[in-house]
Amino acid sequence: GILLFGYVAGARSRHITMNGPVHILLEEEEEQTENIEVKPGEQIEKSAWITVEKSEAKVQVRVKVLADGIMAPQQRDLLENIQMDENWFYCEKDGYFYCAEKLCEGKKVHFQAKITVPPKWKEWTEDLQFRLELAADGV
């Protein structure tokens, strides 16, 4: 089976990234409870609010979806199966999703990714266990 780790009931995780004078806050809320088993073709949702806490100029917010516990080819499989809304675009060169609109201090934007577990993963015989995390910063 394929096990997705680290979904905590009603947990709100907060991460602040400081890149010089730019401070970005990422807040995630998860509805699921414990580790869940996912099947090939199933959809996983990851969403977060991203706030520009501090910045002198308008900043472009970017988010990386990190998959821990699986190899690079499987990570690529997952990233190829992500659907985003039209406010975000993916840059293959660096693996980040960029917000189309630049934000000024105090503004927040919603990031929501629908990730489909690759259907070809059903050919795997060994168990897969992984965790999905989001990381945000501003450029």
Residue map of PLM features:
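Surface-exposed, hydrophilic segments of mature proteins
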Residues: G1-V139
